[in-house]
Amino acid sequence: IAKELKFGESINYKDFALISKADLLSLMVGEFPELQGVMGAIYASEDAQFKNIATAIEDHYKPKFSGDSLPRDSFGDYAALAEKFETLIGLFSINEYPTGDKDPFSLRRNAIGIIRIIIEKDIALNFSGLIDKHMPKDNKDAGSILKAFIYERLSNYLKDKNFTSNEVDAVIS
């Protein structure tokens, strides 16, 4: 997914993937889960090799809630998109969907985060093609279900931005 999103040549996305979750093992994050990412950024900024990805480590969880800020730079944008797509594709591929008001894996939040980053940061991304390429072939329905799930969130996002139902339907179809 990182290659599809074109992380950029100046930052090694493999280094990012290797250390972006290292703070989850720390006692600090274990005791204060809200510091997830924040502590990772602090740890990374202490190592000259990883200083250039410290901000992205903190930002790749964003947005964490409705109205939260978006990542501060393009690498953070791409890292957040990769994180959210990986979560959605992984869970939908094993038929883990939100039901009713239950969403234990925050899949709705991840989908809305993808939509906000793509639209508000003006990122050109064919998420339908990305899903087709990375969804396991043994679960053909999961890709269609995931696309419908994201389109439903996109529809609601656009309506919240005062687009009419006709305008939204024209864009989504």
Model-found features: residue ranges?
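Amphipathic alpha-helical "coupling" segments that flank catalytic cores
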Residues: 1-173
